[in-house]
């Protein structure tokens, strides 16, 4: 093994601070032999077709990480492999999480406009809403750079935010009876994301066992970063790899000799 594994969080497209061009520059600097793409492990599409489709879908935001990877592959050899949970896309379609999340959000907005809204629930809702604007998920107005979102500080912010999302919504379901109808689907969604993180970690370790003396880059939405780092950092000695998660310190670590 003796691989080096980089965890690089992205915003899945250009924001004010995060640029796909900067991700491309990181790939040029790291020169990965293996790139793990956040696509389902059972993806039936040829990887190049998948990347081209993703880049086209995100072209208004610079093509996302797919565009950076495709550009890197123009002049460099690297194997691109999927590592997300099996059946991800079909599960999202089946469960309609995005649609249900939108309905719940609209219900919250309508309820908290009422003068009779529960004051504690209102405070908690505004708290999590404010944190969402500051640490928001792939917000196009986010001013944080690729280095900002790939830092220990951002990892703490995201972990705290996700923990508060769980706790605040648990309180809202209790405080506002009309919200209780959304509790089951919310729980399923949060549990699925936790299962995704565990599956990602397992798949990364499986790939690590298949290669020797390689540099691997794991590309992920930055909301997954902290979970992947926590799940991998304690396994470095056992599984024979070095983990790099802070881009600011990447130049301090020697590169492996490619076989």
Q: Residue spans of the language-model regions?
A:
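Internal alpha/beta domain cores that form substrate/cofactor-binding pockets in large enzymes
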Residues: 1-85, 89, 100
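A short acidic (Asp/Glu
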Residues: 17-18, 45-50, 92-95, 226-233, ...
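Short, high-confidence coil segments that cap the C-terminus of an alpha-helix
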Residues: 32, 211-214
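Hydrophobic, often amphipathic alpha-helical segments used for membrane interaction and targeting
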Residues: 50, 57-211, 231
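Short, flexible loop segments at boundaries between secondary-structure elements
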Residues: 181-182, 186-187, 233, 239-259
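Active-site-adjacent alpha-helix immediately C-terminal to a catalytic or transition-state-stabilizing loop
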Residues: 214, 226-241
């Amino acid at each position: 093994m003796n691989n080096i594994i980089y965890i690089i969080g992205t915003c899945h497209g250009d924001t004010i601070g995060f640029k796909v061009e900067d991700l491309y520059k990181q790939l040029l600097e790291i020169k990965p032999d293996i790139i793990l793409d956040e696509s389902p492990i059972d993806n039936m599409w040829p990887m190049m077709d998948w990347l081209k489709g993703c880049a086209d879908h995100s072209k208004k935001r610079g093509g996302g990480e797919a565009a950076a990877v495709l550009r890197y592959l123009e002049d460099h050899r690297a194997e691109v492999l999927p590592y997300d949970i099996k059946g991800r896309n079909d599960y999202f379609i089946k469960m309609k999480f995005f649609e249900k999340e939108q309905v719940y959000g609209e219900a919250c907005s309508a309820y908290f406009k009422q003068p009779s809204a529960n004051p504690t629930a209102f405070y908690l809702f505004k708290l999590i809403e404010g944190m969402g604007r500051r640490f928001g998920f792939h917000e196009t107005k986010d001013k944080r750079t690729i280095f900002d979102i790939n830092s220990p500080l951002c990892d703490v912010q995201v972990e705290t935010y996700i923990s508060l999302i769980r706790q605040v919504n648990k309180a809202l379901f209790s405080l506002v009876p009309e919200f209780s109808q959304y509790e089951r689907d919310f729980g399923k969604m949060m549990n699925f994301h936790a299962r995704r993180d565990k599956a990602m970690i397992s798949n990364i370790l499986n790939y690590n066992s298949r290669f020797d003396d390689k540099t691997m880059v794991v590309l992920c939405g930055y909301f997954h970063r902290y979970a992947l780092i926590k799940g991998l950092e304690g396994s470095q000695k056992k599984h024979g790899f070095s983990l790099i998660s802070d881009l600011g310190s990447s130049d301090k670590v020697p590169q492996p000799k490619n076989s």
